[in-house]
Amino acid sequence: MKQIETKKAAGMVLCHDITQIIRGVTKDARFRKGHIVTEEDIPVLLSLGKDHLYVWEAGENMLHENDAAEILCRACQNAGMSRSEVKEGKIELSAEHDGLFKIDKERLLRINSLGQMMIASRHGNTPVKKGDKLAGTRIIPLVIEKEKMEPVEQIANEGPIMSLLSYQTKKAAVITTGNEVYFGRIKDTFTPVIEEKLKEYGANITEHIVLPDDHTQVTRAVLKALEHGAQMVLCTGGMSVDPDDQTPLAIKNTGAEIISYGAPVLPGAMFLLAYYGKDRIPIMGLPGCVMYSQKTIFDLILPRVMADDPITARELASLGEGGFCLGCEVCTYPNCGFGKGW
């Protein structure tokens, strides 16, 4: 830091805020710390009584916070993301369309472990709407050594650590099982709930079949739905451990790869996820809670399925932390802790 005549300050970086006071109008910073002085600024600074300024001594090996923020932004920004103008060394990213926000946690941790810089984001695997804020970046000091930003540039060269996956239009088949529905003892109130949730992501039910508790019929129905071009199959009913509940066996007998039967999520513990064939078409067994609980495991899984984002058994297991829905009177999901473990 050094003192310099204001008339010679063009191109220099301010070390402190410069306050402008106009009685009855304003008392606020006219120029912020970190501002790069321009020729046009000099008359204004002089009118504020600033004949001398404290400025940073620029060095060839130093980067201003705005320049460093650009490097951090490049490490983050991907297709479908808009960025703000750099302001006081900070850049924010926002979603240009609805989609599934993804983040490479390992590379994010690498950057934030370097010191003197930070990237803060919303949770990954979160559905977002157009215009939602995604992340912000900045360095901590006003200037930083260029060599400290080199690891960030290397990470950026590997590709952005964030992505925004678009939802795909999908055709869904719903297979309702249960003697009580098949024989007309009760009304099917499950399918309308599924239909509403699918509409939110642009999916349509193109086939709906009601079957008794017979695993062979359910297996045949799943395979036929796949032959008809279903891009996901949702099986409702028959997912618990009662003798009449045969849906898990029916899905297994299709030859699909069972990723998990059961998940550490409440509501939703009896959920089943499988993928069929080389196209990895998702088949799901939905527990009864999906019908009556406001948010369940289905609300965590569906955005990823709609974005063609494969789910592993390990990821499902990681949902245990944060997998307990508190059933708040006013639901704020996804802006809450539910389902943020993966």
Name each region found by the language model.
Residues 7-11, 29, 83-86, 126-128, ...:
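Solvent-exposed alpha-helices and their adjacent loops that cap or buttress functional pockets
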Residues 1-88:
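Short, low-complexity N-terminal leaders and the immediately following helix N-cap/first helix
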Residues 29, 85, 100-119, 126-129, ...:
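C-terminal terminal segments
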Residues 179, 206-339:
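Short glycine/threonine-rich loop/turn motifs
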Residues 158-213, 217:
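Glycine-rich phosphate/diphosphate-binding loop of Rossmann-like nucleotide-binding domains
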Residues 55-56, 81-86, 144-146, 204-208, ...:
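Flexible, glycine/charged-enriched surface loops at secondary-structure junctions
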